[in-house]
């Protein structure tokens, strides 16, 4: 049975009429939200951020994380995120021009799903105590996903939106977004500079950085010459070969 991950289903409330009049920055004059790692986000944005999507779901990097201020410390709030398709167009990466270009109308979008932060609901004091990270949010291109992942269309452009909703009054919804978090959903990275920046800045890609063997010189018979690149990688790969040799000796 398909589950409903819409904002109204999550809040167990009926849809609110004229919702656009409720979700406005006029209602947020006391609440402030600041993007963490904004410098990193801008580096990606300047190149044209890409986010990998898979059928099973893939987490975002950079991770969306914000600092919230101006909440009532004793009131309870639900904090959630959805993705807004900001251009109803399909894009492709032009390698000749080194940029993304529109190729025509986009695919129809399903109603936006919400990713509810696992701490919800919580008092304002809790949300303001430390950065709020959405590191567990996953993106999928599976239109039939029933795991609560955010569904997107590949080669389409999206922007995350952070929603802060008072638990006792769901009509008091405050929405924030940041231009530098825009991205294009892809099933494989298109811009090699994005790939390099992801490897450089993602702590989970440390292994790729350490084991990168580009620049290792090969001699005429295919052996390694022991250049600087090999010397830096050897301490990392030696345990593997030592263990392999040990196993071979045991199996003799």
Swiss-Prot record:
The keyword Oxidoreductase does not apply. Its main location: nucleus. May interact with unc-37. GO terms for cellular component: chromatin; nucleus. Disruption phenotype: Non-striated muscle cell fate specification defects whereby the number of vulval cells is doubled and the number of uterine cells is reduced due to the transformation of uterine cells into vulval cells. Signal peptide: none annotated. Probable transcription factor required for the cell fate specification of non-striated uterine muscle precursor cells. Furthermore, may function with the transcriptional corepressor unc-37. This is T-box transcription factor mls-1. PANTHER family: OPTOMOTOR-BLIND-RELATED-GENE-1, ISOFORM A, T-BOX PROTEIN-RELATED. GO terms for molecular function: DNA-binding transcription factor activity, RNA polymerase II-specific; RNA polymerase II cis-regulatory region sequence-specific DNA binding. The gene is mls-1. It comes from Caenorhabditis elegans. It is found in: Nucleus. Residues 40-210 bind DNA. Keywords: Developmental protein, DNA-binding, Nucleus, Transcription, Transcription regulation. One of its GO terms (biological process) is post-embryonic development.
